[in-house]
Swiss-Prot record:
Region described as Important for membrane-damaging activities in eukaryotes and bacteria: spans on this chain: 106-118
Protein name according to UniProt: Basic phospholipase A2 homolog 1
Source organism per UniProt: Laticauda colubrina
Tissue: Expressed by the venom gland.
Entry keywords, A to Z: Disulfide bond, Secreted
Length: 118
């Protein structure tokens, strides 16, 4: 679920950037998504959106699925669970690790998506 995704992000980036900074970034970070991603970080969000789409095709509900994960010094790791729990955790884990390695560009926060995301 979104709370766990937020915690995964914080674990992966070691608390360097608040999760809220990722909730309205580029064309894909946040609700919806369209057009061409504006940068690598936005591509992470598009990949996560696509992964959620695959989860839904498997009958999972990615926004409300609770899953288990651990935050180790080397980064987060998904725990055991049902097929849906594992799949959604893997989606979020990949995104969180992608966020942690992608540069954050302040000019892509809270952009005019109607103009820039065609």
């Amino acid at each position: 679920n979104l709370i766990q995704f937020s915690q995964l992000i914080q674990c992966a980036n070691k608390g360097k950037r608040p999760t809220l900074h990722y909730m309205d970034y580029g064309c894909y970070c946040g609700p919806g998504g369209s057009g061409t991603p504006v940068d690598d970080l936005d591509r992470c969000c598009k990949t996560n959106d696509d992964c959620y789409g695959q989860a839904e095709k498997k009958g999972c509900s990615p926004l409300s699925t609770n899953y288990n994960f651990d935050c180790f010094p080397g980064g987060p790791q998904c725990g055991k669970g049902t097929t849906c729990q594992r799949f959604v955790c893997d989606c979020d884990l990949k995104a969180a690790l992608c966020f942690a390695k992608s540069p954050y560009n302040n000019k892509n926060f809270n952009i005019d998506t109607k103009k820039r995301c065609k």
